[in-house]
Amino acid sequence: MCYTSSMPDTLLEGLNEEQKKAVLQTEGPVLIFAGAGSGKTKTLTHRLAYLMVEKKVNPYKILSVTFTNKASKEMSQRVSNLFAEIKNLKFKIKNSGAPLPWMGTFHSICVKILRREVDKSELKYSSNFTIYDSDDQKQLIKRIVKDLGYDPKKFNPGLVSALISSAKSEFVDSSKYKKLANDYFNRSISEIYKNYQKRMIDSNAMDFDDLLTNTVILFKSHPEILNNYQNQFQYIMIDEYQDTNEPQYQLVKLLSQKTNNI
């Protein structure tokens, strides 16, 4: 996609001086500190548009990540509205059928990558994997607790699910969890965790934590795949970066290694 004409005022309209600086500083890392409702999302929207319009960056080279589907939809709508204003100013856009920026949550971006690449890896999944939500996880854990003969009152599915999720967010698998366990309860959790993960793999299913950790594992074990995405994503923008957990942080770090345009 290629854009012509001088920069329209719309790209900076309504921004304060600090926001304008963030929009115009496109190379290297930029961190915006601001409270809720202070215009961070608006700044990211204008920065994304500035990259495409003024810097003539192919939208396919831009990755925009949010933490919720609601925020992702809001960002997409804001970008669409901003471009509508630009078009109304007779700002010409060439090749409008070109790919749009990659926009979505960490999880949706990981799903997209894994659907494309997981068959090329040693991960024990195929590209048509299913995704378990919290209810699916709890039902599976409930069955495992029953099959292993544990007291369902002591091993509440919600609690067990949270403990497994916490372990995965630190890249602690069931065998490592077992080594770290120092009492009956945690040794039992490690056994539930082991069975949980085996049944997930046997069902070709991932939970939300798997989506993140498996993408990190994929990139680390296949540098050639990582290289392709590093070359693609020349600019990475993340809403609410301070809320990233370890797998999300590692994903961003891996993807931004070449350009550091984040």
What are these regions (language model features)?
Residues C2-K124, I131, N227:
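P-loop NTPase Walker
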Residues T26, G97-L100, K120-D210, F233:
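ATP-hydrolysis module of ASCE/P-loop NTPase motor domains
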